Amino acid sequence: MKRKLRIAVATDDGKTMRFGHFGDALEYHIFDYEDGRLTFVETRKNLLTDEALGIEEHDNPMKARMMREQLSDCDVFVGHSMGLKNRQKLEEMGVKMIPLVKKGLSIEEALRRALEKLGLS
């Protein structure tokens, strides 16, 4: 039996993966991956956009800690990009960030590519 993973995918429209920083997505679609199957869990509104926090600089380490708290049950973050310092900080906290650079990916295709990068498909 493979270990269960909880995956957060950044999205602004509920259909496609957000093209831009993971931390500025309007919401996250949360999925569980276990025994080769993906199951949708829920949609979570992002309360930590730079605008909401009043942060002007990207890659602020405070935001990485707050993102980890907001998505504390997630093992993998899937999105277009994330600042290097934040990505390193999250990896120190046990979160794997999977960057996917193609614009317009459906959430399903983003998940498929992320699982492939994790060696799970």
Locations of regions flagged by a protein language model:
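Non-catalytic interface/targeting segments
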Residues: 1-62, 100-121
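Mid-chain, well-packed structural core segment of small domains
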Residues: 60-96
